[in-house]
A protein has these predicted regions:
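Beta-strand C-termini and the immediately following turn/loop, strongest in propeller blades
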Residues: 18-25, 32-33, 67-73
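Cap/lid segment of the alpha/beta-hydrolase catalytic domain
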Residues: 45, 69, 82-88, 92-219, ...
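Conserved beta-propeller blade repeats
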Residues: 2-20, 48-69, 109-110, 156-160, ...
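Conserved hydrolase catalytic core segment
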Residues: 232-243
């Protein structure tokens, strides 16, 4: 449903319209050829979870070339020069990780779990490929769920520092954000705010049920408005958590 899609922006060129949107907590880019009226999604790679972006080259709207940005939880930021007409791309810039980085060492999963009222909530899980899924790992579960802010699954070198130590990083795309459109935000604000808290608690329970971790081994994390979330969930379900960062 369109009410579960967030339009992030539109870029107009002489021959093309580029639309960015978010649905099911996944960021996407679509390109429409104005002369043929054909629209296609720009597919960056075989990764399911990533963050795309687009910028004009010298603000030239007569061009067929644009800069495309790309990153994912396991792939550092990259910038490509992309030709919309022949679909060729050239790598222009790539984020350097001084300590070295091999994206194949990491596994990124996108799952959904049922919350207290049956709504399906997206969850992004990033872990080292050597981390065992037997309930022994600690999980850092990040959440925000406020002001319609979506938690895009981008790259973070500091996050990988934890993941390299066998800590699983999970981001719960809970209600109050706009990962599933305007309705997702409205279902997590004002008198519906309890949905934000319940979504997060059910994310923790899902991670325990699926043996990513065990009860009492989850570190909850949320800052600013996410601090309200942390205060609520640790008081509602203290047995789930090893600690709270806020």
């Amino acid at each position: 449903a369109k009410e579960e899609v967030l339009i992030g922006g539109l870029t107009f060129l002489k021959n093309w319209i580029i639309r960015s949107e978010t649905s099911e907590a996944l960021d996407k880019l679509f390109v429409k050829n104005i002369s043929t009226n054909i629209e296609e999604e720009l597919i960056f790679s075989d990764e399911t979870v990533y963050v795309p972006g687009v910028n004009l080259i010298q603000k030239d709207r007569n061009t067929d070339e644009v800069y495309l940005g790309y990153s994912s939880p396991k792939t550092p930021s990259r910038v490509f020069k992309y030709n919309l007409s022949n679909k060729s791309k050239e790598l222009i810039k790539e984020q350097e990780i001084p300590s070295g980085h091999n994206k194949d060492d990491y596994i990124v999963e996108r799952v959904e779990f049922k919350s207290h009222d049956g709504r399906l909530v997206p969850l992004t899980i990033t872990r080292h490929k050597k981390t065992k899924i037997n309930g022994s790992a600690n999980v850092l579960l990040y959440g925000y769920g406020s002001y319609g802010n979506s938690m895009s699954p981008s790259f973070s070198s500091t996050r990988l520092s934890l993941i390299n130590r066998d800590i699983i990083w999970a981001t719960a795309h809970i209600r109050g954000g706009m990962e599933k459109g305007m309705k997702w935000w409205k279902e997590g604000k004002l008198t519906n705010k309890k949905n934000t808290f319940e979504d997060y608690i059910y994310a923790a329970k899902y991670l325990i049920e699926k043996n990513y971790t065990s009860k009492g081994n989850i570190i909850g994390m949320g800052g600013s408005a996410g601090g309200l979330l942390m205060g609520a969930v640790v008081n509602q379900s203290p047995e789930l958590f090893l600690g709270i960062i806020m």
